[in-house]
Amino acid sequence: MSSAAELSPTPFGRLLTAMVTPFDADGCVDLALAGRLARYLVDEGSDGLVVCGTTGESPTLSWQEQHQLLGVVRQAVGPGVKVLAGTGSNSTAEAIEATTQAAAVGADGALVVVPYYNKPPQEGLEAHFRAIAQAAPELPLMLYNIPGRTGCSLAPATVARLMECPNVVSFKAASGTTDEVTQLRLQCGSKLAVYSGDDGLLLPMLSVGAVGVVSVASHLVGRRLKAMIEAYLNGQGALALSYHEQLQPLFKALFVTTNPIPVKAALELSGWPVGSPRLPLLPLDPVMRDALSNTLTALCQT
């Protein structure tokens, strides 16, 4: 086991589910189903839930819908489960307002994505995150780097400076490379809890110092992901690797097109009527849906 995994804190546990947002037949947020899904995910091994992140379709939810959903999930899972709110925006003022509101609703933390579209320089990113941290000093923050969606990347050196803010405690690494974890470790040491933002890279990232994952696949295989993490942490590398290899077909199937299109289809196929994504996202096309169904069937047999 990596010494980094031993030394780094785990402020939100090790397995967090980036929760989908259920919609009813009219396209409205299905709050009752969201509460049931949240409880199910916890029962299946999630230490915490991320509400209204990328997988939760935050770009097409109003802030009112997001705050309502957060409140319902918070109440559904009770105080023993970590609930993080996606509060990022490319407007610093909006992100501050969303983050302070999330704290008031009862979030245990905020997932704050790098500002998208306007592509700030590193100095602007630092000022943006510092302003959010200072506006909600009691709320732990998880910085979220996903350059494939945002168009810019938060540099490890910038993260190191932001750790002057006591509530900057964690980082979701979704750049698609394990080197991001290594560079964060070199710049920030072991105090920063780095979470993989990619199910397929969870095991490699654990080996270089990540502490866990913000997962999409845990909607479907939470217990297996938890078992893989525990096997790695207990020094059972071969067992962890067997889980990693067993789950690869599902990891790939869930990203055959834009997230959360496939995972919502997978949940529908598994008996959870979470509805289609909101436009401009579309339901999974029939050919991909059939392939996904076959993947799920095969997984049930292993």
From Swiss-Prot:
<feature type="active site" description="Proton donor/acceptor">
    <location>
        <position position="144"/>
    </location>
</feature>
<feature type="binding site">
    <location>
        <position position="55"/>
    </location>
    <ligand>
        <name>pyruvate</name>
    </ligand>
</feature>
<dbReference type="InterPro" id="IPR005263">
    <property type="entry name" value="DapA"/>
</dbReference>
<dbReference type="GO" id="GO:0005829">
    <property type="term" value="C:cytosol"/>
</dbReference>
<dbReference type="GO" id="GO:0009089">
    <property type="term" value="P:lysine biosynthetic process via diaminopimelate"/>
</dbReference>
<dbReference type="InterPro" id="IPR020624">
    <property type="entry name" value="Schiff_base-form_aldolases_CS"/>
</dbReference>
<feature type="site" description="Part of a proton relay during catalysis">
    <location>
        <position position="117"/>
    </location>
</feature>
<dbReference type="InterPro" id="IPR013785">
    <property type="entry name" value="Aldolase_TIM"/>
</dbReference>
<keyword id="KW-0963">Cytoplasm</keyword>
<comment type="function">
    <text>Catalyzes the condensation of (S)-aspartate-beta-semialdehyde [(S)-ASA] and pyruvate to 4-hydroxy-tetrahydrodipicolinate (HTPA).</text>
</comment>
<protein>
    <recommendedName>
        <fullName>4-hydroxy-tetrahydrodipicolinate synthase</fullName>
        <ecNumber>4.3.3.7</ecNumber>
    </recommendedName>
</protein>
<feature type="site" description="Part of a proton relay during catalysis">
    <location>
        <position position="54"/>
    </location>
</feature>
<keyword id="KW-0456">Lyase</keyword>
<keyword id="KW-0457">Lysine biosynthesis</keyword>
<dbReference type="InterPro" id="IPR020625">
    <property type="entry name" value="Schiff_base-form_aldolases_AS"/>
</dbReference>
<comment type="pathway">
    <text>Amino-acid biosynthesis; L-lysine biosynthesis via DAP pathway; (S)-tetrahydrodipicolinate from L-aspartate: step 3/4.</text>
</comment>
<dbReference type="Pfam" id="PF00701">
    <property type="entry name" value="DHDPS"/>
</dbReference>
<feature type="active site" description="Schiff-base intermediate with substrate">
    <location>
        <position position="172"/>
    </location>
</feature>
<dbReference type="GO" id="GO:0008840">
    <property type="term" value="F:4-hydroxy-tetrahydrodipicolinate synthase activity"/>
</dbReference>
<comment type="subunit">
    <text>Homotetramer; dimer of dimers.</text>
</comment>
<keyword id="KW-0220">Diaminopimelate biosynthesis</keyword>
<feature type="binding site">
    <location>
        <position position="214"/>
    </location>
    <ligand>
        <name>pyruvate</name>
    </ligand>
</feature>
<keyword id="KW-0028">Amino-acid biosynthesis</keyword>
<dbReference type="InterPro" id="IPR002220">
    <property type="entry name" value="DapA-like"/>
</dbReference>
<comment type="similarity">
    <text>Belongs to the DapA family.</text>
</comment>
<keyword id="KW-0704">Schiff base</keyword>
<dbReference type="GO" id="GO:0019877">
    <property type="term" value="P:diaminopimelate biosynthetic process"/>
</dbReference>
